[in-house]
């Protein structure tokens, strides 16, 4: 009996590897222009890092992580995303002691136990950037602009940018009650995943593709923003406009991770299949402190 690659993985053979090298070289070139420096972290991390950083009530932590107990009886997880490991390295190696803003990027494999479908793999490659040490919304715009330029330079046409503000933890706590008031009467109409999310992480319900038709008339988190969050979001929009980055506001865009504050964004590309989101991210003001570092 011969061996086959595990489900949800790919072999990259001569011919396809050259295309990967082209994409990676474009990513590195753009990062150099924006003064981001490369970081390489382990593909395994302590499971608690993702539980604390990504959020225990997220789909990633609840259903998608590859986790095992090693011979030292430690719970270890193959990294499902790059931010938590990059921030862990930032804290552990005390990069926050540097006088300037820390701007990092990484390229590498990530692992999630995804349901097999077109465009979804259990081992996938991620290019990400992290900018730590500044609260200016112009930095959020710079990160969004870097990604937008990357897609243009690799030849991906028709890319659009969607943005939202998810506010501060206090804003989300207040909005949570308002949203539950809308969702509870239609709970029985929601898909099984959303019914499970309502009590633990109701904002994630708004991200559901299957139930979007039920959310007409849902409250908007933008109406709940405090002055700090509103000022930050307005500053982001001005900076994107100054950079000639076209964008639309999507008040239901919340992303699937718990660490975001203020800015959330996604890149969409038409004509690439059923899954049109090709990238995304956001700001995470509290993540460094959550992982044991100083407030950033």
Model-assigned labels for residue ranges:
Residues 1-296:
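TRNA-recognition modules of translation machinery and tRNA-sensing kinases, especially anticodon-binding
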């Amino acid at each position: 009996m011969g061996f086959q690659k595990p489900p949800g993985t790919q072999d990259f053979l001569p011919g396809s590897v050259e295309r990967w090298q082209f994409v990676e070289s474009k990513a590195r070139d753009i990062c150099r222009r924006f003064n981001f420096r490369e970081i390489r972290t382990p593909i395994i991390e302590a499971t608690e890092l993702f539980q604390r950083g990504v959020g225990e009530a997220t789909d990633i932590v609840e259903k998608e992580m590859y986790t095992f107990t090693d011979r030292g009886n430690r719970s270890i997880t193959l990294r499902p995303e790059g931010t938590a490991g990059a921030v862990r390295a930032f804290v552990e190696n005390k990069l926050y002691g540097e006088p300037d803003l820390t701007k990092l990027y990484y390229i590498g494999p990530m692992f999630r136990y995804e349901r097999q479908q077109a465009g979804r793999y259990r081992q996938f490659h991620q290019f990400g950037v992290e900018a730590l040490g500044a609260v200016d919304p112009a930095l959020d715009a710079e990160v969004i602009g870097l990604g937008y330029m990357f897609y243009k330079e690799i030849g991906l046409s028709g890319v659009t940018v969607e943005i939202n503000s998810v506010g501060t933890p206090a804003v989300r706590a207040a909005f949570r009650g308002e949203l539950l008031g809308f969702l509870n009467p239609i709970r029985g109409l929601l898909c099984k995943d959303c019914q499970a999310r309502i009590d633990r992480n109701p904002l994630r319900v708004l991200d559901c593709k299957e139930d979007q038709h039920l959310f007409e008339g849902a409250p908007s988190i933008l109406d709940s923003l405090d002055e700090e969050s509103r000022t930050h979001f307005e500053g982001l929009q001005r900076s994107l406009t100054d950079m000639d980055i076209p964008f639309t506001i999507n008040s239901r865009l919340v992303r699937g991770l718990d660490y975001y504050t203020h800015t959330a964004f996604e890149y969409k590309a038409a004509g690439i299949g059923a899954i049109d989101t090709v990238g995304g991210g956001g700001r995470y003001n509290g993540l460094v402190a959550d992982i044991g570092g100083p407030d950033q």
